[in-house]
Regions:
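Mixed-charge interfacial surface used for oligomerization/domain docking
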Residues: 1-165
């Protein structure tokens, strides 16, 4: 919408979006491994063992592919790890949070999503006090939840478009 309102043509918008796809990353975790087991993305024995031990996989989506982002033990630790991954991304790519569109996404549990959203905003504001640190909060769709389960939770980042002078 910002690009349209600034007078960009459709071709200019598509060219910019294609070039910026590499800046898109999603850092997320799941409530348990049941849906990943059922979908064949993880073995039954290792998945059930991880569920019993409270191990949460950290999943990274970048360049159109899914990668392992490590593991965390317990739900709160998985929130913290996703937040660390976001902060590391910002450090590695420069700028401030205001140079990016940041979104916290949650599945079924809106309260859990709000907790991560508040933690994310607080951490960003502590590290970048001069930045506005806008962070959106959205519910993920059923297309994602069918693969991850209803309690997926994470954050997405994409570079913001700025009109060139």
């Amino acid at each position: 919408v910002a690009m349209r309102d600034a007078g960009c043509t459709l071709d200019e918008a598509v060219t910019w979006l294609e070039a910026e796809k590499a800046t898109n990353n999603i850092f997320f975790t799941v409530g348990n491994l049941d849906y990943l087991i059922k979908g064949g993305r993880i073995g039954k024995v290792s998945g059930r063992a991880a569920n019993l031990l409270g191990i949460k996989p950290m999943i990274l989506f970048k360049d159109g592919e899914i990668f392992s982002g490590g593991v965390a033990r317990g739900r709160q630790k998985s929130f913290e790890k996703a937040l660390d991954q976001l902060m590391n991304y910002l450090d590695a790519n420069g700028g401030t949070p205001d140079d990016y569109r940041l979104i916290v996404g949650y599945g079924y549990d809106e309260e859990e999503g709000k907790r991560l959203w508040l933690q994310t905003r607080a951490a960003l504001r502590a590290k970048y006090p001069a930045a506005a640190c806008e962070v959106g909060l959205l519910q993920i769709g059923c297309t994602i939840a069918v693969h991850t389960g209803p309690y997926a939770l994470g954050m997405g980042v994409m570079r913001r478009w700025k009109k060139q002078q």
